Amino acid sequence: MTNTLESVMVESSSIYSAEYNSVDNTMLLYFNNESIYRYHKVPLFYWRGLFDASSKGKFINKFIVKKFSFEKLS
């Protein structure tokens, strides 16, 4: 069975954890202000790009927040 959910702790002033589900291409971002957002239909290369980015917050604002539909979970 293939692992479809990847969860990673993140060193960032914006987020502390992130998850990616490769079955439905959803990305969960856990923000330091205790908000949790689920972004829909995020291609895998954005998930990988997040970890290559020198600033996670800038990457999220530029490539995730304005491009993908989302829901606030908390």
PLM ranges: what are they?
Residues 1-10, 14-74:
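Acidic/histidine-enriched, beta-strand-rich ligand/metal-binding domains
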